[in-house]
């Protein structure tokens, strides 16, 4: 304790030691009951040291004190962090978007099953920034509502410049998550609502409950139950908008045949009897809206045969607007028989037309020659009792008559005849739409630059149906269709499909999925232009470099040749000088240097010409330019 302030010169007196030397007090001090230390300070010290200085000295000297203090501080810090995280975690909100990001591996697996690839960054961008701008109610945090997903999908798949092909893999994956949710997404998927029950005509508060309806509502009616009829309700003025909504599309026709009375009396007798309250002003206004002239109503969506409010089949003919729209919005039978056949098939299934309606439909959508060809093919499809096509006139006329039959749609036998007639008519449309066999037409169907493999396959199958007698859906024709799909696909897709491993064991569905994957990984037009520009620049740079190298090589070759030429000239001159020196050194003492004869010297040579010396010719030197 010599370092403790104020203890200089102190006398330390220790009590007797404890009998148990292994026991220690706090911070290593002996226990209280075993003795204590008396500190006697300096007599001259007037003021005792403060306790803080004593504690600091203990902190500096005792390792146990430091360990205990650090442990207490660490525990407090951990407790604070735990409480903070608990409060924040309790306030976290899970959204469909965050849920998909937390299970991104499963999302990628589902996308791979759909033969598409998705990226997390674009997933977030489309969900939070792109799809909310479609004005279909898509929230920024995403949703698993099937209706909203379907509306966004329609926007994405829109043809022309309004579509978004780059968003197709992402909305397809969203749709797969909603319609086939994994376990972690099932609690967030909206349950599929049951199909809404169409309101029945007698349930409207405008007619007395016991009266027989004189006209049917536009909306499908329910068969009346066997129980007691509900009491009619009188709507208040606040419910006026509901009544307006129900009467937006009034029925265009009155019932030409009043339904049989069920014993409750007609509506004219029921109203004065006082069984129903007087109609309200809103109901009067509604009745006024529902009773315009029949000829002005041309926007009907009603079926020719449908169940009325009393459970009886009622007849509603086609409206002129429906026939007009079907004719103008579809190609002719000669141009595209498949599309028009599909339209007529849907009409036959949903509208359940009578014999007269079928003739009206064929007369509107087909030309005279096309109609005769369809009727002829339909009569050829009539089968006899043995199940094989028959040519017996009585059986053919009974199944597919050319004159108006007396089939009553209110009876079971009449409805059976109508069903058979519609089936034969559909078979006649399919057979009449086939052109003569022309395989060249099938081979001429090729995939467009921006056409998806699925759309191309549909066009190819339609060509098979139209120009060949084969059915592309037949398993025996799958190999031929698959080979045509590979050979007539786009060049980049066809090359990759031909290099697939185990190609002979691939089904047509496998080839389509692989083609879709290749199609989705194609570069965009902007990327293609950038690649072409970059390749052009690289080619120009490479050509310029090659030209510079060739020019440098040509200069080096020219300098090398000139150097060789100069070296040859210089060496020849040197040899000439050396040769002249050697010849001059070989002359004898009395030999002439001019005529090489002995007996005189060159200055006395008689053969040497005399007279003045002419000018010496100028010596020409060879330069690099020569």
Swiss-Prot record:
Zinc finger spans (CCHC-type)? 590-607
**Record's Pfam families?**
Gag_MA, Gag_p12, Gag_p30, zf-CCHC
Region Disordered: what ranges?
Answer: 195-310, 523-626
Q: Which residues form a coiled coil?
A: 526-566
* Signal peptide start-end: none
- SUPFAM superfamilies the UniProt entry points to: Retroviral matrix proteins, Retrovirus capsid protein, N-terminal core domain, Retrovirus zinc finger-like domains
The name under which this protein is listed is Glyco-Gag protein
Native organism: Moloney murine leukemia virus (strain neuropathogenic variant ts1-92b) (MoMLV)
Query: Lineage of the native species?
Result: Viruses, Riboviria, Pararnavirae, Artverviricota, Revtraviricetes
């Amino acid at each position: 304790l010599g370092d403790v302030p104020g203890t200089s010169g102190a006398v330390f007196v220790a009590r007797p030691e404890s009998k148990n030397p292994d026991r220690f007090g706090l911070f290593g001090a002996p226990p209280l009951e075993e003795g204590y230390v008396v500190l006697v300070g300096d007599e001259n010290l007037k003021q005792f040291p403060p306790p803080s200085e004593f504690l600091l000295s203990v902190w500096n000297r005792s390792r146990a004190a430091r360990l205990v203090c650090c442990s207490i501080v660490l525990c407090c810090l951990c407790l604070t962090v735990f409480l903070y995280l608990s409060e924040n975690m309790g306030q976290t909100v899970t959204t469909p978007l965050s849920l998909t990001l937390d299970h991104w591996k499963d999302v990628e697996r589902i996308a791979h099953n759909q033969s598409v690839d998705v990226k997390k960054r674009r997933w977030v961008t489309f969900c939070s920034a792109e799809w909310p701008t479609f004005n279909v109610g898509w929230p920024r945090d995403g949703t698993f509502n099937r209706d909203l997903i379907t509306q966004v999908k329609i926007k994405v798949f829109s043809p022309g410049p309004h579509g978004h092909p780059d968003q197709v893999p992402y909305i397809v994956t969203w749709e797969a998550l909603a319609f086939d949710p994994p376990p972690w997404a099932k609690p967030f998927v909206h349950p599929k609502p049951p199909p809404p029950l169409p309101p029945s005509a007698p349930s409207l508060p405008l007619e007395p409950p016991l009266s027989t309806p004189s006209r049917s509502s536009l909306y499908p009616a329910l068969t009346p139950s066997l129980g007691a009829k509900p009491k009619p309700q009188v709507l208040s003025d606040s419910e006026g908008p509901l009544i307006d909504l129900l009467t937006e599309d009034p029925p265009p026709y009155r019932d030409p045949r009043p339904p049989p009375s069920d014993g409750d009396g007609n509506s004219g007798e029921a109203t004065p009897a006082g069984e129903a309250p007087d109609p309200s002003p809103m109901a009067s206004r509604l009745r006024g809206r529902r009773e315009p002239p029949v000829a002005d109503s041309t926007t009907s969506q009603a079926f020719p045969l449908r169940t009325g409010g009393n459970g009886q089949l009622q007849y509603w003919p086609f409206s002129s607007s429906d026939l007009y729209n079907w004719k103008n919005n579809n190609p002719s039978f000669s141009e595209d028989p498949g599309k028009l056949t599909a339209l007529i098939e849907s009409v036959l299934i949903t509208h359940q037309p009578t014999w007269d309606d079928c003739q009206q439909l064929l007369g509107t959508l087909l030309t005279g020659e096309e109609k005769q060809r369809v009727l002829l093919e339909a009569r050829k499809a009539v089968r006899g009792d043995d199940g094989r096509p028959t040519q017996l006139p009585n059986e053919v006329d009974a199944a597919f008559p050319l004159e108006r039959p007396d089939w009553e749609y209110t009876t079971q036998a009449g409805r059976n005849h109508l069903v058979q007639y519609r089936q034969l008519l559909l078979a006649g449309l399919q057979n009449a739409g086939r052109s003569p066999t022309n395989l060249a037409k099938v081979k001429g169907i090729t995939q467009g630059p921006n056409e998806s493999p699925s759309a191309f396959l549909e066009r190819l199958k339609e060509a098979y149906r139209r120009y060949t007698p084969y059915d592309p859906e037949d398993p025996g024709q799958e190999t031929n269709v698959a080979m045509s799909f590979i050979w007539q696909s786009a060049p980049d897709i066809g090359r990759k499909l031909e290099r697939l491993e185990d190609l002979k064991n691939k089904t047509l569905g496998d080839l389509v999925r692989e083609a879709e994957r290749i199609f989705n990984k194609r570069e965009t037009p902007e990327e293609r232009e950038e690649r072409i520009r970059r390749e052009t620049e690289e080619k120009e740079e490479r050509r310029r470099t090659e030209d510079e190298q060739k020019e440098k090589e040509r200069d080096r070759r020219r300098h090398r040749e000139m150097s060789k030429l100069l070296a040859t000239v210089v060496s020849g001159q040197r040899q000439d000088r050396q040769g002249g020196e050697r010849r001059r050194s070989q002359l004898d003492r009395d030999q002439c240097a001019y005529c090489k004869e002995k007996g005189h010297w060159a200055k006395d040579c008689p053969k040497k010409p005399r007279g003045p010396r002419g000018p010496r010719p100028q010596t020409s030197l060879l330069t690099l330019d020569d």
